[in-house]
Amino acid sequence: EEREHMQEAIRILSEITGERPLGWYTGRTGPNTRRLVREEGGFLYDSDTYDDDLPYWDSESTPEKPHLVIPYTLDTNDMRFTQVQGFNSGDDFFTYLKDAFDVLYAEGCEGAPKMLSIGMHCRLLGRPARLASLARFIEYVKGHEKVWCARRVDIARHWHATHPFTAERN
């Protein structure tokens, strides 16, 4: 049943956008989700994990069928506007993103690669005051050198090109 739902989602997204999706995120995975994503093929990555800060090759990857994982986040995520201990205002969201960025930027300047993933949903962050906090954050980030703001598909393409799968890396 999960495979059928996945195939239907791919069909619908392809029909609506004119392109097949290149990444996958379920959000509520089952024991077979990643295997089904690999078997379905055609994906550059999936984001159904919260276990790391950087992309990595799935442990089931093979040279013939490498599978990239780009972790998602619940930490720097606008879903926290819906939680009791989450964000109460756009200022909370901005400050949290800024603090996360500042720590990662400093670590990156010391030579450690970093990635800040921000979970955004139009029904949450698309509210005027919340959107203003995102605009402020983007302006803040643009004031720093050597920062790349990218979509997940761009990160996946970069990772495939720059850090290709090898059995030794896995």
Where are these regions (language model features)?
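Active-site-adjacent pocket scaffolds in enzyme catalytic domains
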Residues: 11-15, 19-111, 166-168
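Glycine-rich phosphate-binding loop at the start of an alpha helix
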Residues: 3, 31, 116
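Generic, low-specificity signal for short hydrophobic/alpha-helical stretches with a mild N-terminal bias
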Residues: 6, 19, 79, 86, ...
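C-terminal domain-boundary segment and adjacent tail
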Residues: 45, 98-170
